[in-house]
């Protein structure tokens, strides 16, 4: 371009050239984040929507999918209501009800049928609802009623409840463990009846710890012991270690329980001998709390250990020809993001892969995080960062694909066949609806709010369907993998 200012025509040529140059430069810049609109399609790659239910516009936490006779039933725990709508309307009863548990028939995943809402504790957000669900058949429990199906759920933060849901549309309360605070993400072994309950026992120095119960006869719960980190127990002094978030047991066959402490900071992975935990000395002294522990791994203070998902022994492709340690014992850890729009106070939360082959000295060997720039997620509203993974160990996906929720980035399908090199192979970001709630940050002392998807927890079933629920009241999305992601599994082509 020649910058000569002799004539008006040349001036016009210069101006036109500058406009073209500016347009070219802008074309190379990432597009500004667009606020989602009602009616926009979902964003997806190698995953597709099969079915949807709005869950009566309730903020949802944990989906548990249970094969019940010839039916498949989803038991979905809910957070408490919002300040604006503390008791959403249940159109089946015509009554406003505090959030609790949604029971949905997903036998036909394309046409889920809402069966029952079971109200939870009065209260909003974390103070109310009934977030957690686990389900066992009575015929599997050593002392259960063979004709019963048992739902273990939290009741707000105050209790754990057991219901008979053999008729899922008409649950019946069987037992209740109350006098607690801050109950949360528990684990129940159906073959033994041993339950690891995330509880807050008032005498302990921490908000959440573990109560181990024998629920082999759900009508007659028997407490086995209390457990936590030394320094959390009654009568201890000094610094109180990071609170518990949850755990996953491999049962008597694997003889391990993997505990995760910390949500978005101060994370600890704890590997525990299950037999010693259940049958060892019960008094919560520092020595007794240490006795069943095989190994611990302290994470960075910047990240938590929300979900600790044991993958077990895996052959690592790059080590396949090694004569020693070609198999590695792997654990997947997922943190939970808590702060909206990537604001100060929290590091980016993500997923981590831990080699626990030497159980006394586990170590992180890989990580994965959704690239923020791929969707300008920090600008979309709500939380951006990981939250939780599926926990099913059914063969259809186990050690092949993991599904991890990323709040406003939806659910991500991660190829974990080589856990030293995980890679994303698909995603699904649901579309917002009229029910989707806003999320706010403070700007100059005032609320600045955006409506955003907040994909919360995810689970899979043995058939290969993926169930993701939304924290921002959007509902339940039932998905399946397609294309290259599906080829990783043994599922038939779709």
Q: Which sequence ranges carry the predicted segments?
A:
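Feature marking well-ordered beta-strand scaffolds used for ligand recognition
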Residues: 32-494
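N-terminal secretory signal peptides that target proteins for export/translocation
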Residues: 1-13
